[in-house]
């Protein structure tokens, strides 16, 4: 019995003349995600991509699991391929759904007939197939409001399809269709979530991280690399830039007022990030900041940080509570890694009493008391690049 995976488009189905480019991007992302599971043929029609396995014994459960994490997909399911003939549809429905229906107590039938030339209308398909299933599985009863199993028949242009499970997709837009951005990836909970959220809007992310040995450990860097690797499940391949930051932090400590340590550090991080971002054709920076969460994330502090940037700074977590961010972190499997007790450079030389409402002129005066430009250039030149590929 021939089986395929049906992938239903999300909001990209509403796109206009450029809808085709979104579809092509989604198919490209799907192909890369399942390339080591076997050979597949991918076709698209009527806001659906059909994943047709060309090899025998392909693990379609693994296909569904991987594809379900790809942005741009509203729903997906495994489905049995039938001829556009009701006798074939009903016979294969009984056989294909035997295990599911044998364990259920209630069911209903839904029919979607996009091919209006098909002889039977949707209500007729539901009634006829429902009767056959009741005859074959007499323990079942019909429940149209809250069934355990919903048997769906889709009659399309080339074939009919039968399935009983509709899995919610990741939603959003295909990664890559909205351009590139650079994620400031720390070892905390928020920044991986921010990267995931912007990837959901179709942005292909790169990541940048700052290390300050001996104040930060190799294990802290490994933790961030693990987070980056986890994000590839959703974001695809990620270019990871590791910036040496020790000299800059020591210069801040030795030459700037303590109350401005954190805000000046953030401004210099942004300066380095945007220089690398511009070289890599990234259109924006991404951070995990949330208003009022810590001293460096007040409105005044963020305004001072943004003043150092020439490109937009995207903050998808800006209006979220910590509990909301943690909920997403658990969902995408970054939370347990994020809470490992290895501190990053943001905790180095933390002031006892940071300025929570800094004035830009005061911050700029404090920063300009020392010429950081040679250290910035050196940090950019010594930045190391590592590529994290999706290779599950």
Language model: regions and residue ranges:
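RNA-binding accessory domains that recognize and position tRNA/RNA substrates
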Residues: 1-182, 192-238, 307, 355-360, ...
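Active-site adenylate/phosphate-handling loop in enzymes that bind or generate adenylated species
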Residues: 128-133, 166, 171-178, 245, ...
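Structural beta-sheet core signal
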Residues: 183, 207-209, 242, 287, ...
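Conserved G/P- and acidic residue-centered "switch" motifs that form tight phosphate/ATP-binding loops
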Residues: 188
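A conserved beta-strand->alpha-helix junction
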Residues: 228-255, 344
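Small/polar glycine-rich anion-binding or flexible loop at a beta-alpha turn
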Residues: 293, 341-349
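A short alpha-helix-loop-beta-strand transition element characteristic
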Residues: 333-341
């Amino acid at each position: 019995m021939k089986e395929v995976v049906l992938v239903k488009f999300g909001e990209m189905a509403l796109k206009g003349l450029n809808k085709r480019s979104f579809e092509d991007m989604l198919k490209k992302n799907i192909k890369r995600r399942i390339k080591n599971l076997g050979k597949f043929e991918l076709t698209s029609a009527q806001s659906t991509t059909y994943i047709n396995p060309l090899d025998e014994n392909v693990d379609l459960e693994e296909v569904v699991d991987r594809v379900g994490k790809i942005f741009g997909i509203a729903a997906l399911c495994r489905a049995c391929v039938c001829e556009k003939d009701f006798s074939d549809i009903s016979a294969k429905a009984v056989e294909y759904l035997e295990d599911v229906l044998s364990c259920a107590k209630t069911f209903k039938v839904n029919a979607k007939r996009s091919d209006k030339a098909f002889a039977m209308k949707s209500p007729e398909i539901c009634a006829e197939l429902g009767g056959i299933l009741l005859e074959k599985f007499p323990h079942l009863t019909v429940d149209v409001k809250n069934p355990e199993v919903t048997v769906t028949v889709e009659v399309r242009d080339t074939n009919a399809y039968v399935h009983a499970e509709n899995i919610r997709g990741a939603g959003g837009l295909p990664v890559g269709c909205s351009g590139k951005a650079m994620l400031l990836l720390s070892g905390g909970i928020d920044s991986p979530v921010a990267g995931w959220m912007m990837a959901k809007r179709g942005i292909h992310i790169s990541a940048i991280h700052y290390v300050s040995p001996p104040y930060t450990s190799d294990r802290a860097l490994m933790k961030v690399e693990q987070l980056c690797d986890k994000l590839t499940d959703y974001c695809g391949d990620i270019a990871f830039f590791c910036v040496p930051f020790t000299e800059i932090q020591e210069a801040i400590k030795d030459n700037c007022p303590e109350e401005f340590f954190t805000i000046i550090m953030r401004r210099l991080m942004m300066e380095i990030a945007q220089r690398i971002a511009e070289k890599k054709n990234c259109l924006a920076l991404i951070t995990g900041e949330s208003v009022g969460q810590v001293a460096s994330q007040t409105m005044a502090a963020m305004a001072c940080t943004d003043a150092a940037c020439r490109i937009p700074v995207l903050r998808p977590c800006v209006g979220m509570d910590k509990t909301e961010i943690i909920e997403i972190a658990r969902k995408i499997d970054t939370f347990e890694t994020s809470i490992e007790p290895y501190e990053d450079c943001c905790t180095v030389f933390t002031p006892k009493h940071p300025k929570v409402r800094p004035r830009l002129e005061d911050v700029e005066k404090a920063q300009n008391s020392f010429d950081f430009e040679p250290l910035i250039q050196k940090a950019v030149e010594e930045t190391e690049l590592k590529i994290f590929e999706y290779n599950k």
